Amino acid sequence: MIITVNPATAEPIAEYPAMTSGEVREAITLSYWDFIAWRERPLPERAMLMKRLAKLLRIEKEQHAALISLEMGKPLSQALAEVEKSALVCDYYAEHAASCLKPEESKLDGGVRGVVKFEPLGLVLGIMPWNFPFWQVFRFAAPAIMAGNGIILKHSPNVTGSAIAIEQLFRDAGFPSHLYSAVHIALDDVDRLTGFIIEHPAIQGISLTGSTAAGRAVAAKSGKALKTSVLELGGSDPYIVLDDADISQAVDSCAAARLLNSGQSCIAAKRFIVHARVFEQFERLMLQRMQSAVMGDPFEKGVEIGPLARHDLREQLHGQVTRSVAEGARLLCGGTIPEGQGFFYPPTLLSGVHKWMEVYSAETFGPVATLIEARDDSEAVLIANDTPYGLGSAVFSGNTERALAIADQLDAGCCFINSMVKSDPRMPFGGVKQSGYGRELSSYGIREFVNIKSLCYKER
């Protein structure tokens, strides 16, 4: 049995039956037969249904946003934005899949014509997390389905209601009934049944968004089965603030990037590396901003920070903070578990952070910001890259050329200048090092799960 819990009250929401091996096998079989027919559907027909799906998301936006906030605790305003962004990615691939998948022609030797085609791969398993329960799914599923594939979704158990709602959306939009199928697996059966799904011959690709540990496990299983995989894993994104930056604007962007989704995002700002000449000013303004953030019921207007999604996540985050303070970090605000119900954790600011402290380079999944002082640009780059992760990064400077020179040295999948990191359907998204491999979104993302077929022939 799967039980979902309201993180704002710690009270149960609903119970769902966990699927058995036989039920999972049946779901894969039904999805496979729908894929066989779907792969032959012309792109304009696929696009029509994807457009209809985007429209449904917008029509039903309020009810889906409320479910997101109820199950994982993000403020309702942010949940509404998540549903809208999910509709946006559906629109994007409905409008651009044809150009992304357009065959590429070449003239070869001896009058031979070469054509590169992008054909459907098969069923793709999506293993998705709870922190953006709609966006993470649509970011993966929209391009895969437009490419002609079928989807098996294994969502995080604490957002099972969202998984069911998304499955119904695909059916209501007119997609084949089992082309997109969600499987619901109990926590104590995840390893066994996930392995079973990966090994199933109908599954030809795996996309995981999750922890580095989960990525290692899935990569091992995928590699053993010789199946392609895309991994979007953890991050410890550095935000570098140079001495010529607009400090007030930098603080606004940095705080927003740290507190969005109550800090529970792989591309949230984690480490703020600030030039020594402006460190005290940045620290003072950042403290004011963190202290002014409103924490509370995610359904109340004006709330910026809701609860963390689960009790164990709060315990883990608090442990990282207390260990770092014991190692010498200065706690400027927050850092205590509040009394009362729910899994709340206050905005927390740590300064004087240095190497060997846990928060120096590790991923902190919650509203905890760490300040690290750098003497110059070179040291800022060294600190930024001194982490196992390489997902996102940002540089704040009044000199674009200087900022771009630093961006070129950062080991990250993306870098934003004078703004917070965010994903965009038009740009590839993914990381390096222990943040994973492969790309989502844009033309690069839709081509991750296709058969890139070379065709060579002479006209007769």
Please annotate each region the language model reported:
Residues M1-V112:
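N-terminal Rossmann-like NAD(P)+-binding subdomain of aldehyde/semialdehyde dehydrogenases
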Residues P7, S21-V24, L43, K61, ...:
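Residues at or immediately preceding the N-termini of alpha-helices
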Residues T9-E15, I203, I240, V294, ...:
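Conserved C-terminal structural/oligomerization subdomain of aldehyde/semialdehyde dehydrogenase
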Residues A10, S31, R46, I68, ...:
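Residue-level signal for inorganic ion chemistry
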Residues I13, G174, A213-H354, I417:
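ALDH superfamily catalytic-core signature
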Residues A14-M19, D34-E40, G126, Y239-L242, ...:
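Short, well-ordered beta-strand elements within core beta-sheets of diverse protein domains
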Residues F35, R39, A54-K61, A65, ...:
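Structural signal for hydrophobic packing residues in well-ordered secondary-structure cores
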Residues S106-S248, A374:
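Rossmann-like NAD(P) dinucleotide-binding subdomain of oxidoreductase/dehydrogenase enzymes
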